[in-house]
């Protein structure tokens, strides 16, 4: 991932490097909760319903406490019957956010933060990118996650 834009002093040009070969897709699936580090799963292709269901069963379900609320946006794979059943079987309550409301979803702030930091690193190779994602996940401050939840709740009260 590379930065798309740059700044320079007035009258001077910005120069930089960027690979021009084709790139590979790396998708992230994740979950956050108060007081704990994020759970993230990587995929070397687009995420479909089967991969998301695997994430829910393997990573999310063991992490859920009875009565937890699992907040999801309106992506079609989130609304699959098998996903909903897996969340309910784990003892949680699925909550779907209104359409076009990423400001209410605290994990969107994690993705924005990770993308910004990954662009700053300007990594070229896929293994480097995957290692960086793991490092960034581990380095995510728990206090920052709490702030993301507070901000999303404040947005919900405004609406």
Placement of each model-derived feature along the sequence:
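RNase H-like polynucleotidyl transferase catalytic core
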Residues: 12-20, 89-106
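RNase H-like two-metal-ion nuclease catalytic core shared by retroviral integrases
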Residues: 25, 73-74, 95-119
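C-terminal anion-handling pockets and recognition modules
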Residues: 107-159
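Short, hinge-like loop/turn segments at secondary-structure boundaries
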Residues: 6-10, 88-89, 113-115
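Short aromatic-enriched loop/helix-cap "lid" or pocket-rim segments at secondary-structure transitions
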Residues: 1-5, 83, 107-109
């Amino acid at each position: 991932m590379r930065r798309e834009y740059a700044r320079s002093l007035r009258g001077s040009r910005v120069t930089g490097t960027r690979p021009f070969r084709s790139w590979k897709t790396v998708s992230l699936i994740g979950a956050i909760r108060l007081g704990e580090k994020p759970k993230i799963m990587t995929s070397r292709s687009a995420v479909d319903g089967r991969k998301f269901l695997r994430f829910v069963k393997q990573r999310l379900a063991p992490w859920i406490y009875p009565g937890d609320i699992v907040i999801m946006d309106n992506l079609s794979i989130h609304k699959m019957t098998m996903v909903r059943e897996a969340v309910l079987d784990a003892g949680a309550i699925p909550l779907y956010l209104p359409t076009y409301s990423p400001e209410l979803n605290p994990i969107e702030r994690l993705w924005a933060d990770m993308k910004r930091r990954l662009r700053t690193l300007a990594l070229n190779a896929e293994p480097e990118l995957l290692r960086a994602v793991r490092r960034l996940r581990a380095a995510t401050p728990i206090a920052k996650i709490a702030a993301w939840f507070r901000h999303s709740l404040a947005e919900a009260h405004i609406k």
